């Protein structure tokens, strides 16, 4: 493999620590061509679709990418804002707020946001951090619960970038934070604020993104981590277990996924006479297609059509202060031992560069 050329090494340059926040991704616009590009990248990832390539790729390019882009584009159009894709907007706001919050706490680190699929890509943002002087980078996926299809795929993208890079910075990775006290606190405050404004429903449904059931048997901890998040949140809200339901959404394909499925569960609740439900999505840290369209629109319609009377979708953590504080705490723990609070000494850097030139360095 050919490694990308690097600028000539310069002595006396300031070394900085950085954080790369990574979310799933989004198309560039809500159009069929943009969705075709996005879905081709997303669904070609062997972490996402664990089917032999020789079987899956003809199906993907011969069937899925001919039909799905137009349907998905219409769904994205229903949630698109003047600022763009909600997921990208919220993720970039989180990066900006985290930069400020860490700076206020004495950690002036660089923070950038990347998308695993789409733009800005992981590789693009890692290159940008290097260009800004980052020599130590913490990779922090915005997935609280670990799954091979999400968290590990982010790591794959970083490893692929590193394999092409000549001078690789020090790298650290955050694996998960499904039981982090700050994360649970932020979720609890988010739901409590909703209750203060709208009252409390008869049931709280916690909907997580689904994955194929067989991944649980193959050793993926995702299901267990979702359940632990739900248990800790239930305790934080002082609810009884029977008042909370854990469900899984966004099933793709015909294989059995983690159950119970969100929409059928909501229909059953309505048919059982449960007239008011609240739905929150703890596994999503930013509102996106899966929350704003699949839950707030489609699931709501299904519940009301089945006889339910009041459906409230509780927004994701987005730019809530408690969430940014939790992200900051998570980052600081994983940055331990790196000089995040040491400001470069210009005089010392100049002296270092001078000594190097005296020994024959060119820069």
From Swiss-Prot:
Name the EC number(s).
Answer: 4.98.1.1
- One Pfam family in the UniProt entry: Ferrochelatase
State where the protein is found.
Cytoplasm
**Any single Gene Ontology cellular-component annotation:** cytoplasm
Give the binding site residues for Fe cation.
209, 290
Where are the bilayer-spanning segments? Answer: none
Write down the InterPro entries for this protein, in alphabetical order: Ferrochelatase, Ferrochelatase_AS, Ferrochelatase_C, Ferrochelatase_N
As one GO molecular function, the record gives: metal ion binding
Alphabetized, the UniProt keywords read: Cytoplasm, Heme biosynthesis, Iron, Lyase, Metal-binding, Porphyrin biosynthesis
Which reactions is this enzyme annotated as catalysing? Answer: heme b + 2 H(+) = protoporphyrin IX + Fe(2+)
Q: Which GO terms describe its biological process?
A: heme biosynthetic process
Pathways involved? Porphyrin-containing compound metabolism; protoheme biosynthesis; protoheme from protoporphyrin-IX: step 1/1
Family annotation (NCBIfam families) = hemH
Q: What does this protein do?
A: Catalyzes the ferrous insertion into protoporphyrin IX.
Similarity field: Belongs to the ferrochelatase family.
Protein name (database record): Ferrochelatase
């Amino acid at each position: 493999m050919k490694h990308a050329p690097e600028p000539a090494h310069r002595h006396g340059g300031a070394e900085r620590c950085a954080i790369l926040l990574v979310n799933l991704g989004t198309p560039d616009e809500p159009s069929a061509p943009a969705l075709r590009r996005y879905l081709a990248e997303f669904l070609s990832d062997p972490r996402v679709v664990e089917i032999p390539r020789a079987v899956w790729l003809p199906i993907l390019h011969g069937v899925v990418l001919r039909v799905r882009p137009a349907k998905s584009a219409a769904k994205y159009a229903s949630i698109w804002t003047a600022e763009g894709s909600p997921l990208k907007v919220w993720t970039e706001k989180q990066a900006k707020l985290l930069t400020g919050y860490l700076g206020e706490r004495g950690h002036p680190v660089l923070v950038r946001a990347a998308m695993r699929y789409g733009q800005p890509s992981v590789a693009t943002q890692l290159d940008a951090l290097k260009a800004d002087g980052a020599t130590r980078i913490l990779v922090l996926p915005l997935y609280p619960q670990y799954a091979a299809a999400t968290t590990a795929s982010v790591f794959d993208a970083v490893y692929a970038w590193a394999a092409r890079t000549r001078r690789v910075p020090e790298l650290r990775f955050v694996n998960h934070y499904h039981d982090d006290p700050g994360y649970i606190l932020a979720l609890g405050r988010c739901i409590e604020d909703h209750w203060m404004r709208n009252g409390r429903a008869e049931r709280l449904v916690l909907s997580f993104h689904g994955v194929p059931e067989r991944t649980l048997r193959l050793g993926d901890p995702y299901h267990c981590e979702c359940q632990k998040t739900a248990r800790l949140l239930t305790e934080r809200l002082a609810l009884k277990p029977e008042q909370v339901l854990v469900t899984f959404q966004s099933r793709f394909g015909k294989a059995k996924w983690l159950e119970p499925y969100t929409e059928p569960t909501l229909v059953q609740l309505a048919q059982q006479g449960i007239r008011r439900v609240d739905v929150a999505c703890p596994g999503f840290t930013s509102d996106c297609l899966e929350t704003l369209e699949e839950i707030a629109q489609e699931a709501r319609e299904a519940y009301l059509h089945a006889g339910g009377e009041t459906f409230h979708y509780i927004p994701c953590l987005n730019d809530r202060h408690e969430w940014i504080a939790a992200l900051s705490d998570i980052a600081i723990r994983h940055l331990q031992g790196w000089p995040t609070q040491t400001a470069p000494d210009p005089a010392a850097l100049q002296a270092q560069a001078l000594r190097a030139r005296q020994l024959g360095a060119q820069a």
